[in-house]
Amino acid sequence: MARDEVRRILPADIKREVLIKDEKAETNPKWGFPPERRPMEMHMQFGIINLDKPPGPTSHEVVAWIKKLFNLSKAGHGGTLDPKVSGVLPVALERATRVVQALLPAGKEYVALMHLHGDIPEDKILAVMKEFQGEIIQRPPLRSAVKRRLRTRKVYYIEVLEIEGRDVLFRVGVEAGTYIRSLIHHIGLALGVGAHMAELRRTRSGPFKEDETLVTLHDLVDYYHFWKEDGIEEYFRKAIQPMEKAVEHLPKVWIRDSAVAAVTHGADLAVPGIVKLHKGIKKGDLVAIMTLKDELVALGKAMMTSGEMLQRSKGIAVDVDKVFMPRDWYPRMW
C-alpha cells in the first residue's frame, strides 16, 4: 500500500492577514526595548529557552536546575515531558515565565516508536493509523497527574516513517494534552494485537522546533560560562529566545505608543488604542497585544471580532489577563 504524502500543519502554522486601522500611526524609537536591543541581563529576564530535554530527569527537575544555574527567581516550562521522554521543552525565564500559557493552542509534534504485540500486514497498519487522524476520545493514563475524565483531543496528522517487523516509527501532530501512550494503546486495540510505546521524542511545541535554536543543558552551561567568565555573550544570547517567539502563532493586536502604559498599569485595551490587527479574531480568542516595535505587552481575551475592532471607535476590544512589559518602558500619557 502506497504511503500518502502527509501535510504536517499545526495551528501554529496558520498564516494571518494584517488589517490596518490607522495608517499614520508611528512609534517613538526612544521608548521601549525591542528584542534585538535588549541588554543581556534584560534579554534573560524576558527570555525563553528552546531546550532539548534529555531522557532521565523530570521536566520540573530540569527547570529547577536551570533556575539554580542562572540564579533565577522564577522559571516555567511549556508542556510536561515524562522522565523517559526527550525533546523540545520550552523553558520561560523570570518575567517571561507565564508566557508558556500562549503555547497551549499552538499544537505539538512527536516522533514515536510503537511496538506491536503481533504481526500485522503493512497496508493494514497504514490504513488503521490513518483512521486516528481527527477528533479522538482519550482518558488520561493511570500514572497521569490529571483527573481521569474522558475528553476529546485532535490529531492533526499521522505520518508513518518506517515499519520494521513489529516496530512502527511514526510522526504525529496533536492538540496539547493528547497522550501519545494512550493513542498507541488504542491503535494496538484497533489492530487487534495490542501495542505499547517503546520510545518518544517531542520534535515541536508550537513555534519551538528541532532547529538551530534548540540547545542542550550542556550547551547552556558552556554558553553561560562564556558570558560570565569571559564576557562573550554571543552564544548565550542565541541560546535564549525573546518571549515574543512564544506568541508568534497567536492572533495579534498592535497598539499605539500612547496606549502601552495604560495596559501595563492594568487597563483593558480600548478600541482607540489599536493601530492594526490580525484578521479572523473571534470573541474569546487568546490574543497577544504588541507595540509597533513588535514587543509583547500583554495577553488577553478578545471581547470583539476583528471586524468589530476595525469598524468601531470605542469599547473594550481585549480583556487583559497577563501583562509582561514593565510599567516604565513607555511613558504615561494620561
From Swiss-Prot:
GO biological process terms held by the UniProt record: box H/ACA sno(s)RNA 3'-end processing; mRNA pseudouridine synthesis; rRNA pseudouridine synthesis; snRNA pseudouridine synthesis; tRNA pseudouridine synthesis
Source domain of life: Archaea
PUA domain: from which residue to which, for each copy? 250-325
Reaction(s) the record says it catalyses? uridine(55) in tRNA = pseudouridine(55) in tRNA
Q: Does the keyword Isomerase apply?
A: yes
Q: What class of enzyme is it?
A: isomerase
Q: Does the keyword Isomerase apply?
A: yes
InterPro entries documented for this protein = Dyskerin-like (IPR012960), PsdUridine_synth_cat_dom_sf (IPR020103), PsdUridine_synth_N (IPR002501), PUA (IPR002478), PUA-like_sf (IPR015947), PUA_sf (IPR036974), tRNA_PsdUridine_synth_B_fam (IPR004802), TruB_arch (IPR026326)
Active site per database record? 82
EC number of this enzyme: 5.4.99.25
Instruction: Tell me which UniProt keywords the record has, alphabetically.
Output: Isomerase, tRNA processing
Give GO MF terms, alphabetically. Answer: RNA binding; tRNA pseudouridine(55) synthase activity
Name the protein family.
Answer: Belongs to the pseudouridine synthase TruB family. Type 2 subfamily.
What is the stated purpose of this protein? Could be responsible for synthesis of pseudouridine from uracil-55 in the psi GC loop of transfer RNAs.
Recorded protein name is: Probable tRNA pseudouridine synthase B
- Species source reads Thermococcus gammatolerans (strain DSM 15229 / JCM 11827 / EJ3)
Its lineage reads: Archaea, Methanobacteriati, Methanobacteriota, Thermococci, Thermococcales
